[in-house]
């Protein structure tokens, strides 16, 4: 019985027999894969660089039904992710393809792209780029293309995604992010503060928000 498979693409907290506790986006590997890779015929869970075989785990706490991943760590899905953003925002496919390609394998810096996955399906995503098509080049970098599929709205997915992105960028040394939007009252829920009105490249004024963060993300060892 593959009792750990249900935790694939979720966010969990794992307690180990060593007494250590880890939390983060979780992926499941089957016994056949682990036999080939590690000569251990057991199922396992992965959080970032950490691997937990079933015998290592004393407790699993499900934190969220979905998981957030940086696209830089998921190069095999780059075309699927590119198409997902293109279909939501109708910006030319090649523009997304070029930006997403630039982030692959990059452990720091801009651009970065992120997706939220539930049951092997992308349900939300956003990016971090230098400038989201506005005149204030000094307000950088910018969170852009924030989108949650309609079936998954009002479930905390947007806040989950935004916090992950802010924490991940802070771990890279980028603790201040900006976001251009026409929404009022939405981003304030997640710790963003209104900064100023900014004119976009289309000549229209939009609201600029700022978020400051010093936390770290990813797989976290909780001692």
Question: Where on the chain are the PLM-derived regions?
Answer:
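Conserved RNA-binding domains used in RNP assembly and mRNA/RNA metabolism
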Residues: 1-65
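A short beta-loop-alpha structural element at the N-terminal edge
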Residues: 66-81
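Active-site rim helix/loop that mediates acceptor-substrate recognition in acyltransferases
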Residues: 86-118, 127
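Conserved acetyl-CoA-binding loop-helix of GNAT-fold acetyltransferases
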Residues: 145-148, 154-167, 179
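Conserved glycine-rich acetyl-CoA-binding loop
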Residues: 136, 149-160, 172, 189
């Amino acid at each position: 019985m593959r009792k750990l498979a249900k935790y694939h693409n979720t966010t969990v907290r794992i307690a180990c027999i060593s007494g250590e506790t880890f939390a983060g986006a979780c992926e499941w590997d089957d016994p056949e894969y682990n036999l080939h890779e590690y000569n251990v015929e057991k199922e396992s869970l992965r959080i970032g660089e950490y691997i937990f075989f079933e015998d290592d785990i004393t407790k699993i706490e499900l934190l969220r039904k979905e998981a957030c991943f940086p696209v830089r760590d998921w190069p095999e899905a780059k075309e699927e992710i590119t198409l997902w953003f293109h279909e939501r925002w109708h910006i030319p496919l090649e523009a997304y393809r070029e930006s997403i390609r630039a982030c692959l394998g990059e452990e720091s810096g801009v651009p970065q792209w992120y997706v939220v996955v539930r049951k092997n399906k992308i349900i939300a995503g956003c990016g971090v780029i230098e400038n989201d098509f506005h005149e204030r080049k000094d307000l950088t970098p910018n969170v852009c293309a924030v989108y949650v599929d309609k079936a998954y709205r009002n479930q905390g997915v947007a806040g989950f995604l935004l916090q992950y992105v802010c924490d991940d960028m802070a771990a890279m040394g980028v603790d201040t992010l900006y976001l251009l939007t026409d929404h009022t009252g939405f981003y304030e829920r997640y710790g963003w503060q209104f900064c100023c009105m900014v004119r976009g490249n289309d000549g229209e004024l939009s609201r600029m928000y700022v978020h400051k963060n010093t936390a770290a993300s990813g797989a976290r060892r909780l001692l």
